Amino acid sequence: MVQNKLKKSVGWAALKYVQSSRIIGVGTGSTVTYFIEALNSIKEKIEGVVSSSNYSSNQLKKIGIPLCNLNSLHELDVYVDSADEIDSHMQMIKGKGGALTKEKIIAAAAKKFICIVDSSKQVNILGRGPLPIEVIPMARSLVARELVRLGGLPEYRHNVITDNGNNILDVYNMKIVNASLLETKINNIPGVVSVGIFAKRRADIVLIGTREGIKIIE
């Protein structure tokens, strides 16, 4: 499949940006799976990885790369992750895999955030697809009502519990013109753990896998 080839190419291209880092952050998703595959080729140079999900942690363990606790680190040089959508300002929507809270924490801790995507993830305005929001279970209905007031159409993601023990609401009909403002508004709703808008901490470098090769935006 062409899309998988693009994901693999951009996953391997990200190796260039972690060669000098002994400890790195790693996200979650199908594109990141290819990056983890690529890490296997330089694992002897890596002291440890801060992982954003149990799924990625298991992948890293299988290839023998040790995991690190973010609390034990003074600094984190680089974080590599993918996105569900990304605009020309390097603002993103993330969270399809349910790991948005840990992804946001690691991104905030890292000096540099490398986003790896295939060209299908590029959008003019964020909100083409659903916006994931992690919520405390007891607040799910309250948060949903507040999201309706903001113009959204929230749907409960059934049979999904995050690594933090919470629920996910997927919000449709959100054309996100001012991503930073909406990120703040949703984060301020009681019961919201994290919203999948990455505007305040956007990517520093974006690698886009295209049919013509790797496109780099800085």
Curated annotation (Swiss-Prot):
Pfam families named among the record's database cross-references: Rib_5-P_isom_A
PANTHER family given in the database record: RIBOSE-5-PHOSPHATE ISOMERASE
HAMAP family assigned to the protein according to its UniProt record, in alphabetical order: Rib_5P_isom_A (MF_00170)
Full protein name: Ribose-5-phosphate isomerase A
Biological role stated in the UniProt entry: Catalyzes the reversible conversion of ribose-5-phosphate to ribulose 5-phosphate.
Subunit structure: Homodimer.
Catalysed reactions, as listed in the record: aldehydo-D-ribose 5-phosphate = D-ribulose 5-phosphate
Organism ancestry: Bacteria, Pseudomonadati, Pseudomonadota, Gammaproteobacteria, Enterobacterales
First-tier enzyme category under EC: isomerase
Active site (record annotation): 103
Gene Ontology molecular-function annotations: ribose-5-phosphate isomerase activity
Gene that specifies this protein: rpiA
Keyword Isomerase tagged: yes
UniProtKB keywords: Isomerase
GO biological process assignments: D-ribose metabolic process; pentose-phosphate shunt, non-oxidative branch
Residues that hold substrate according to the record: 28-31, 81-84, 94-97, 121
EC assignment: 5.3.1.6
Gene Ontology CC: cytosol
Pathway linked to the protein: Carbohydrate degradation; pentose phosphate pathway; D-ribose 5-phosphate from D-ribulose 5-phosphate (non-oxidative stage): step 1/1
Membership in a protein family: Belongs to the ribose 5-phosphate isomerase family.
